[in-house]
Curated annotation (Swiss-Prot):
InterPro entries the record matches: DPH1/DPH2, DPH1/DPH2_1, DPH1/DPH2_2, DPH1/DPH2_3
UniProt EC number: 2.5.1.108
One CC-aspect GO term: cytoplasm
Name used for this protein in its record: 2-(3-amino-3-carboxypropyl)histidine synthase subunit 1
Co-factor requirement: [4Fe-4S] cluster
Organism: Gibberella zeae (strain ATCC MYA-4620 / CBS 123657 / FGSC 9075 / NRRL 31084 / PH-1) (Wheat head blight fungus)
GO biological process, one term: protein histidyl modification to diphthamide
Pfam families (alphabetical): Diphthamide_syn
Amino acid sequence: MEEDRRQTDLGTAADIEEAQLAQASPSPAIENETESAAQTQNGATPLKQPKKRFVGRRAATEAAAKNGSSGATGESGAVATAKPRRAPRLLNQVPKEILENPDLKAAISLLPANYNFEIPKTIHRIQTSGSKRVALQMPEGLLLFATTISDILTQFCPGIETLIMGDVTYGACCIDDYTARALGCDLLVHYAHSCLIPVDVTTIKTLYVFVDISIDATHLLASLEHNFASGKTIAVVGTIQFNATIHGVKSSLERGGFRVLVPQIAPLSKGEILGCTSPRLTEDDKIDLILYLGDGRFHLESIMIHNPTIPAYRYDPYSRKLTRETYGHEEMQSLRRTAIHSARSARKWGLILGALGRQGNPHTLGLIEKELKARGIPIVHLLLSEIFPGKLALMSDIECWVQVACPRLSIDWGYAFSRPLLTPYEALVALGEKKDWGDGVYPMDYYGKDGLGRTRPLQIAS
């Protein structure tokens, strides 16, 4: 997935991290000069330095100028200079005629200035790919900008047709390349989510636009400094829209006396969490608190479930409020254990494959189906885009349901169903194929590297 992120232009977060690393790391040449000077002042004979087999061109040129020769061959000089580094080649580099187009800039000004919809990059992608019918998919919170974006793209890409996909989009798992292809589209632009489904897996050409949102970081820093004593260790996480801000404020918080950790659950980006996937923070990290940057609680609850003993706080960049958040861990775990216990005595199971975008993984479904067949348990298959209690209640002969769609549907709403509604993990626990979490932590790693959301055919066979 990290390769996919590079192909879709990772953006400012990586640039900020690299710049901070460069500032924090002193040059080796400066370190050597400082050490030599200190030894000379103390009257000590400087130690013979090992030969530098390969050095950068700039360092080699400086050494040659000092020695009055074109190639340094002394005891501590360079014996070879590095070849000139080729100019960096940027993928999806947008031409100046697009970036500096005054008419395009005027059109983009109709959109919120702090929302980066990457319009120039999208136009360039449409032009270079030769796309004629472009699907635009975004969460409901951004749909009010959809027609404006559509108008801009059709104006600056003559001859194309845009199609706004209006079905609900809960997250990155809902990317709907299947429907876009069925509607004759040859490019899908998916907004506000990371590339959970790789671009080499989608059935049509796909462009992910993260929609970086700029916020007032000064107020965030002031709020933290006012409420927490310096020296605290903070784990900072958020949704992909605020990922650049997370990396941007890290150095400022560290200057304020805080120790900052930006955790990662691979293959997601550092600091990024999903409603079903978040990093597990260890005791060695010595985290004092979790800070979530974003609105709403859905994503925050994921890391709270996965780290029940660490206090969690939410900074809402829209209301500019910092709040302490809590979660009913005991109640949730009790409800899920009850559902698992009931499922063990079920005589007929129903397997639901989620059809909302890419939510349903057929290989995960196949893994559970294999275990049920091995035990001789009758199965009914159901394909649903959205799962409601009333619909499942119509099939009263099914005594247990397993939904391969969104784990949070069972965790948040499982109590509303008349029959147990299990996640894939819970189903495997009920069948004795996975261990119960016991007195420990309920896992939230569905789209992690080894999560059940990433089940492959090989895992079913084994």
